[in-house]
Amino acid sequence: MLIDWFTVVAQALNFLILVWLLKRFLYQPILDAIDAREKRIALELADADTKRADAKRERDEFQQKNEVFDQQRAALLGKAMEEAKTERQRLLDDARHAADALATKRQEALRSAQRSMSEALSHRARDEVFAIARKALGDLATTSLEERMGEVFTRRLREMDAKAKAALGEALKTASEPALVRSAFELPADQRAAIQNAINETFSADIPLHFATAPEVVCGIELSTNGQKVGWSITDYLASLEKGVDELLKERDKAEPQSELTRQIRKRAYELYEQQGRKEGRAVQNWDKAESEIRKENLSPAKTEPPPEAKAKPKPEEPKPEIGSP
């Protein structure tokens, strides 16, 4: 069998043309469509991965924000509760302090009223006593008594200490006017001369004097010049006594709050004694307990000693201890 090479070549060429046509018009569009679909699927998968990552990130952020919010809410709630508790305690303390201050103020007002009345009575009694004393001494002062006062004055003038004597002598010597000598009664001439001689001898100079009467100089004589003064009279004794009484009253006023505290402790100790019954050694225990309770009311910071009757143990046969009346 002979091979027709022309036919073979033609068939091969025809096959190649067919393959090219199939590839050009059939396979290539299909491949292009497949590639396009693969690219679209890849893009969709990439977009899905991106969205999934974004969703996960947003979820994590949301969870973190929720945790932070819960922590902040718990912190704010705890802070609000603590502030409410603090404010409640502050209001209670303010109310307690206000009540304590009001009670203390009322007690202080009562003590002040009692103290004022006591002071008024004491001062009135003191003034009356001194007024009566001055009037009685003024009525009893006679001319003979004034003469005796003159002798005492001249003696004390000579017995002056050097410093006071020098100051008075300088004032007498430099005075532009006569020195003033005052007495309750008008001095006789001989007594004036005695006083003049005593002054001249004491200060070694001729000192001009002016004698005058002054009812307030009770039973005494007074010499004054240029702001310097020397003398002796019963009025000075009364003034010294009055000053001593004033100091005694001031000391009593200072000690009065302590006495008030002791009075209240006595009262409280007696109440505790009545509540607990009469037992051996109960008085001292009651005193310490009463003092502790009273000090909580801020009545006094000082330590108060129990009275002797509270320190001693009460006898069983006695009806009640001598703690003292409130």
Swiss-Prot record:
Signal peptide: none
Keyword Ion transport included in the entry's annotation: yes
Record's keyword terms, sorted: ATP synthesis, Cell inner membrane, Cell membrane, CF(0), Hydrogen ion transport, Ion transport, Membrane, Transmembrane, Transmembrane helix, Transport
Keyword Metal-binding: no
Topology within the bilayer: Single-pass membrane protein
Annotated TM spans: 2-22
Any one GO molecular-function label of the UniProt entry: proton-transporting ATP synthase activity, rotational mechanism
Pfam families assigned to the protein according to its UniProt record, in alphabetical order: ATP-synt_B (PF00430), DUF2934 (PF11154)
Subcellular location: Cell inner membrane
Sequence segments annotated as region (Disordered): 275-326
Major site of localization recorded for this protein: membrane
Biased amino acid composition, Basic and acidic residues: 275-298, 306-326
Record text on subunit structure and interactions: F-type ATPases have 2 components, F(1) - the catalytic core - and F(0) - the membrane proton channel. F(1) has five subunits: alpha(3), beta(3), gamma(1), delta(1), epsilon(1). F(0) has three main subunits: a(1), b(2) and c(10-14). The alpha and beta chains form an alternating ring which encloses part of the gamma chain. F(1) is attached to F(0) by a central stalk formed by the gamma and epsilon chains, while a peripheral stalk is formed by the delta and b chains.
Function of the molecule: F(1)F(0) ATP synthase produces ATP from ADP in the presence of a proton or sodium gradient. F-type ATPases consist of two structural domains, F(1) containing the extramembraneous catalytic core and F(0) containing the membrane proton channel, linked together by a central stalk and a peripheral stalk. During catalysis, ATP synthesis in the catalytic domain of F(1) is coupled via a rotary mechanism of the central stalk subunits to proton translocation.
Family recorded in the similarity comment: Belongs to the ATPase B chain family.
Name the UniProt record assigns to this protein: ATP synthase subunit b 2
Organism listed in the record: Albidiferax ferrireducens (strain ATCC BAA-621 / DSM 15236 / T118) (Rhodoferax ferrireducens)
Lineage: Bacteria, Pseudomonadati, Pseudomonadota, Betaproteobacteria, Burkholderiales
